[in-house]
């Protein structure tokens, strides 16, 4: 059996796995990505990218493709509860996409998952990722030095081994890697299955408006479980029906269910793709890391789709994990840095899964709302206010929580508008490629350069008031700094350390070494 080596093997080429590969490439580390499917998503699936991940995509060269893939002229999402798409409307409301300009320089994206996966895959390949579709993981074995995986190429029917320093489990909610690594799950359980069907019905073009992104929740006793979802796509005349069970049906039976959901018994339907089923569930891994195996995406946290944060959380998992893997693989950091993946991402994944679970009742089943719903942050704090607590944060809080950015270690580095000559940019545009030191003090700038050279770790030093100007005078207050302070921002845009005192290279050296497990 042939054998090959790679620094990182990623199993699963959905949003989580592809984003991990993308940012590993951004940090100079190639990865092999294996996925059992023929290619990236062949249905629209989820839609939307939060400003927080879009900021990172700007630096990685993906944001423009995401924005270009959004359906034009749709500034809002309309949700309709009805007995059929063309029938009686029981309730409807529109959600305008909020303006987060005070918190982020990036607009949110509205690309479908299908378009997003394709864009990320293209850029990941450009940055060195080796994507292998129709490839199945058959076994894995880890030891103190790495992971050995047996892969099966379904196209050639050949089996081969890959030896990797680390394995990323991005194989979804039905994946096997978590169990093989000895990781259990907990949560509120499963609520059912959905089969998604992509179809074309030109007769609906005049009846279903394209001025908004539309989602219909159809309540009709003629449908499985008495309900279905109907969603517009990027293409006029194409729609997706979500059937609430996992039964196999003939094409004629599927067409009949579409007609019931639409309310048109004579509707002409062209089936484009009868997709596989997926599970609606609330389930979170007990650990996100087990030895040299690290979980991301649905493999780590499966959540109801109500709220649209499953994909965003998956992409954030990949971005946050990638810089840590890259730092360890390159020798910039010790292996214990990777312990922070579980310490930082598991509480966040749990919170977002809880949030989507609460949404499921508040939006769809308010009369069945259980008494023990978990407390969740408001949406703005959920997107922008997560406070991490781990050894990769120095001088922060002892426990995770939620607070809007203030420059406190463990929180998102605040967005401040700066000028570089005539160019406007954000502090957030300076991040995601490596460590960054922000300061107004030339002594701290010099200290940063010296410490980086001693550690052998790349550092971008930006002096506010020198090459970058703070014309609005908000940098210092936004970051909680004095005129002789400094902040060290990690490659994921999180404040790793902050000082409000005069320059002291030894203090920076000690803090940075702790972050990196050096």
Cite the ranges covered by each PLM segment.
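Conserved FAD-binding catalytic core of PHBH/FMO-like flavoproteins
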Residues: 122, 166, 170-280
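A conserved short coil-to-beta-strand element within the FAD-binding core of flavoproteins
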Residues: 133-148
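Active-site-adjacent segment of FAD-dependent monooxygenases/related oxidoreductases
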Residues: 42-123
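N-terminal Rossmann-fold NAD(P) dinucleotide-binding loop
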Residues: 17-18
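FAD/FMN-dependent oxidoreductases across multiple families
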Residues: 249-309, 313, 348, 352-356
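Glycine-rich FAD pyrophosphate-binding loop
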Residues: 25-46
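Core beta-strand elements of the Rossmann-like FAD/NAD(P) dinucleotide-binding domain
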Residues: 4-6, 156-166
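Helical substrate-recognition/capping region of FAD-dependent monooxygenase/halogenase enzymes
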Residues: 1-7, 11, 26-27, 36, ...
């Amino acid at each position: 059996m042939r054998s090959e080596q790679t620094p990182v093997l990623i199993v699963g080429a959905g949003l989580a796995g592809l984003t991990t590969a993308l940012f590993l490439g951004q940090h100079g580390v190639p990865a092999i990505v294996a996925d059992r499917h023929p290619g990236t998503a062949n249905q629209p699936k989820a839609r939307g990218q939060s400003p927080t991940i879009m900021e990172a995509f700007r630096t990685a060269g993906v944001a423009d493709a995401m924005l270009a893939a959004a359906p034009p002229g749709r500034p809002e999402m309309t949700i309709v509860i009805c007995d059929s798409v063309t029938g009686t409307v029981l309730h409807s409301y529109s959600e305008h996409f909020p303006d987060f300009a005070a918190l982020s320089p990036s607009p949110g994206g509205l690309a479908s998952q299908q378009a997003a996966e394709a864009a990320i895959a293209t850029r990941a390949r450009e940055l060195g990722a080796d994507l292998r579709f129709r490839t199945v993981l058959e076994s894995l074995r880890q030891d103190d030095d790495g992971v050995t995986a047996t892969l099966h190429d379904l196209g050639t029917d050949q089996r081969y081994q890959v030896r990797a320093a680390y394995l990323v489990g991005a194989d979804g909610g039905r994946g096997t890697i978590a169990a093989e690594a000895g990781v259990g799950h907990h949560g509120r359980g499963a609520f059912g299955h959905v089969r998604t069907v992509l179809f074309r019905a030109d007769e609906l073009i005049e009846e279903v408006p394209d001025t908004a992104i539309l989602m219909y929740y159809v309540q009709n006793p003629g449908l499985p479980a008495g309900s279905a979802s109907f969603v517009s796509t990027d293409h006029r005349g194409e729609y997706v029906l979500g059937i609430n069970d996992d039964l196999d049906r003939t094409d004629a039976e599927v067409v009949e269910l579409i007609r019931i959901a639409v309310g048109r018994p004579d509707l002409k339907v062209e089936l484009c793709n009868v997709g596989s089923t997926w599970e609606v569930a609330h389930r979170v891994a007990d650990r996100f890391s087990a030895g040299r195996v690290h979980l991301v995406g649905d493999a780590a946290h499966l959540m109801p789709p109500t709220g649209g944060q499953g994909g965003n959380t998956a992409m954030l998992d990949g971005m946050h994990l990638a810089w840590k893997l890259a730092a360890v693989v390159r020798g910039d950091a010790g292996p214990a840095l990777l312990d922070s993946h579980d310490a930082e991402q598991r509480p966040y994944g749990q919170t977002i899964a809880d949030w989507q679970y609460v949404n499921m009742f508040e939006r769809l089943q308010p009369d069945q709302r259980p008494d023990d719903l978990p407390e969740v942050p408001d949406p703005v704090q959920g997107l922008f206010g997560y406070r991490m607590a781990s050894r990769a944060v120095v001088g922060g809080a002892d426990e995770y929580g939620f607070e809007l950015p203030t420059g406190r270690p463990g929180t998102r580095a605040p967005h401040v508008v700066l000028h570089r000559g005539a160019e406007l940019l954000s502090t957030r545009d300076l991040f995601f490629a490596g460590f960054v030191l922000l300061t107004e003090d030339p002594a701290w700038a010099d200290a940063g350069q010296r410490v980086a050279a001693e550690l052998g770790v790349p550092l971008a030093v930006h002096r506010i008031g020198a090459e970058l100007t703070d014309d609005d005078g908000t940098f210092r207050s936004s970051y909680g700094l004095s005129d002789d302070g400094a902040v060290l921002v990690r490659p994921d845009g999180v404040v790793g350390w902050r000082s409000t005192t005069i320059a002291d290279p030894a203090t920076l050296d000690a803090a940075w070494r702790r972050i990196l497990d050096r």
